[in-house]
Amino acid sequence: MIFAENGYICNPHFMQSHMEFVDTHSHLYDEAFAGEEDLALQRAVDAGVTKLIFPDIDSQSRENMFAFADRHTGHIFPCLGLHPTSIGADWENEMAEMERYMDRKIWAIGEIGIDCYWSKEFLDQQKEALRIQLEMAAKRDLPVIIHSRESTELIINTLKECRHLGLRGVFHAYSGSLETFRELQKLGDWYIGIGGVLTYKKASIAETVKDIPLERIILETDSPYLTPVPFRGRRNESSYVPYIAQRLAEITGTELSEVAGTTTSNAHKLFNI
């Protein structure tokens, strides 16, 4: 039975199951949660989502992200990076600002990559920023969180050129083919991030994941975006990870407990949390 609590949908099966989940991509520090961040985190913990990876965006939200993480050490693990859609004419200043935080404890370089969906105006700058940040990750022996919206081929070509760096990481919100996944496996220790899109009708990733080993999958929400069914249309949050896990279990014919255990173990291994 599903019931409403404080205006949010809760499922007591998840809350009482003692299964542990990791949300490997949450922007719970986003202004969409202003004044509610701590409550949203508590809902996540109550649902078994005890650890959240916070990918960085840019200087506009970075300080808020670290402040939130500092209040909840052990639950929140912040990262550092310049999001490709934040790369514009002043991108070098943004990069310099980001490097001021390099003495902070971080668990990955990200969210980084190339975005060809919104604009290609600064595509060359996106490519250069990606290379710089891949080198930063290699130097610090950190995983990377890759944003690849309509740019997977470009990023794979970059990874081939940077193979000597020994990179590892996750392709966030993976929407590629099985063939692309197999190509990634030849380039290093790469996982795919599966989120709310998996629950949508006609989502192509639902077919692809059937042939991808569970040992290569980690779960994510991309909160406050990409809300899973049955909550699509409202703000996403980390407490919804179990619904993504449930759908993955249904599609792959796997027990929910196995999905929870394996994806959580994968996240612990990749991010060293």
Regions found by a protein language model. Name each.
Residues 2-273:
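Mid-domain alpha/beta scaffold segments of enzyme catalytic cores
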